[in-house]
Structure formats: C-alpha cells, structure tokens
Amino acid sequence: FGPAAAAYAASPVHRAGADLDAMLALGREVAARRVLDVACGAGHTALAFAEQADEVVALDLTPAMLEQAAALAAERRLTNLRFERADAAALPFPDASFDLVTSRLAAHHYADPAAAVREAARVLRPGGRLMLSDIVASDDPALDTFLNAFEVLRDASHARDHRIRQWCGFFRDAGLAPEVLGPWPMQIDFDAWVERIRTPPASVVGLRALFDHAPAPSREAFGISDGYDFRLTVAVIVGGISAGS
C-alpha cells in the first residue's frame, strides 16, 4: 500500500460517504472523547473524528499511509492526533483505553477479522462502541463469489468482503451486541478504482473480461455499466460494551 498512499489521500470514496456521516453522527451522540481509528489508511476517518473528539489515535501497518495521514492533519492544523504503526489484531494499548474504536473501508484486508474485533472490544471502555464500516457481500452465494473474485483480481492483498451476518457474528463472539447502519450504495469509477491501487495491466484486462462476461444477475446487482463503472454496498456494524462490564 505504500506506493498507493497518495492516491488514497485523494480518493473521493475514502474522503467522504454516507457511512462516514453516520459514524460521525453516532460519535457525537455518544460523546466519544478518546477515539482509536484502526487501519486508518490516509487518515480521512481519523481526521474527521479529530474535529469532534479530544484525542484520536490513528493506527496503520503501512508507514507511507501514516505519513499521508500526518501530512493531512498538518494541513488542517489538527493537533489532537497521534499516529502509531501496529496490526489491527494486536493493538498496543491497555484494556479499556478508548471510548470509541473505528475502522472504515479497511477490514476486507484483515487476515483475521475475528481477532481484530476481539482486540477492538478489549480496548473499549465500559459504555464504549466499535464502529466498523466496510464493503459487504450479498447473502446470495453467487454474488458473494463474484464480488470477492473481482476484488482479489484488482488487489491481491484483498482478503474478503464479508456478509453483514458474518460481521454480526464476529461482534457477538467478542461480547459486542451488533446493530447495523445502512447499507448504502457506493458508486465506483472503474478507472480510478484500478489506478488507485496500481492494478497490473494484465489484471485490468482480466477485470474488464470478467465484467463483460458477468451473468445477468451479477450485472444487475452491481450495476455494471458499458464503461465498467459499477456499484458496491457499504454498511456500518456498531457494537457496544455494556456500561456495567
């Protein structure tokens, strides 16, 4: 992700969205003062929460992403952020450290999403919330397979777009009672999508062929256009730690 960091800093779908608006609104509602943004990427979510929280810790595994996030924070003159390099499945913080843990458009890269959810739950204070936004797969097995096939072809680091019910299961297993915000459609510009992650030319050809030969239900579900633009689905899963925990 290092070479792609600048492209993610400029990405419209990472900079804004209905899912981010919903996360920010809930953050204000619960008056979260100390926030951890996991797999922060270029920092858009962390910076947005820094506008309304006392302190935000932005965490990512990729140094270039952290550098981009720090540069954006400096541009906006935000001084209540700090940046740390660490893995979502091994958070370097004590138990009960944060009012809110967020992760946006990143969890499809998690090698062990269940472990990441458990770690997020561990560092939440009583009454705290985990808010995880990501692209979600359909409960239809054929649509699920098609989605994850083209995601991997575009980006070999893709692990899986999970179904909403799978995320809810991860939350329950970590002791979090899940609720779902959304889902919302996310319109994708094909050319920008492959350029952002520097998809190899041969894989771009493969993606176009995959879309050209997609079954009618897949073309309809993903809104695939003649120019290859298409539509994904995003949802936010929210889980809370009981104040009595």
Where are these regions (language model features)?
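Class I SAM-dependent methyltransferase SAM/SAH-binding core
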Residues: 36-38, 42-90
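A short glycine-rich, Lys/Arg-flanked "PGG" loop and its adjoining helix->strand segment in the class I
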Residues: 114-126
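Conserved Class I S-adenosyl-L-methionine
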Residues: 42, 113, 177-245
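A short acidic, Gly/Pro-enriched loop at the edge of an enzyme's catalytic core
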Residues: 89-100
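A short SAM/SAH-binding and catalytic strip from SAM-dependent methyltransferases
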Residues: 99-111
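Conserved class I S-adenosyl-L-methionine
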Residues: 1-30, 44-48, 65-68, 131-153, 192-194
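Short alpha-helix
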Residues: 160-174
